[in-house]
């Protein structure tokens, strides 16, 4: 009975090893496979990163790869928390005063 378990364990290990080898041989060799992209796949690739062109040649660089979006304000003045809170309260009070009937 113990020999049967050992034989089954060896057979299972050999099967797993053969499966791993067969899958590793069928994996793509290059880092990027050339394929025909569908419109839905292109929209997925665009995503939130603003990608509008996926180059099939990796040596082209980032010339058309991404859109440069402004993400930071041009205002370089740093506001402290107290100034920001005072500004927010002022805006809220003005909005409340404008909403009251005369």
Curated annotation (Swiss-Prot):
Domain of life of the organism encoding this protein: Eukaryota
Molecular function terms, GO-annotated: neuropeptide hormone activity; type 2 galanin receptor binding; type 3 galanin receptor binding
InterPro entries assigned: Spexin
GO cellular component: extracellular space; transport vesicle
Subcellular location: Secreted; Secreted, Extracellular space; Cytoplasmic vesicle, Secretory vesicle
Coiled coil ranges: none
An annotated GO BP: long-chain fatty acid import into cell
Site (Cleavage): 35-36
Annotated keywords: Amidation, Cleavage on pair of basic residues, Cytoplasmic vesicle, Hormone, Secreted, Signal
Up-regulation conditions: Up-regulated during female seasonal sexual maturation and after ovariectomy. Up-regulated by food intake in brain areas involved in appetit control.
Pfam hit, one: Spexin
Function: Plays a role in the regulation of food intake and body weight and in reproduction. May also play a role as a central modulator of cardiovascular and renal function and nociception.
Family the UniProt entry places it in: Belongs to the spexin family.
Protein name: Spexin prohormone 1
Lineage, broadest ranks: Eukaryota, Metazoa, Chordata, Craniata, Vertebrata
Gene: spx
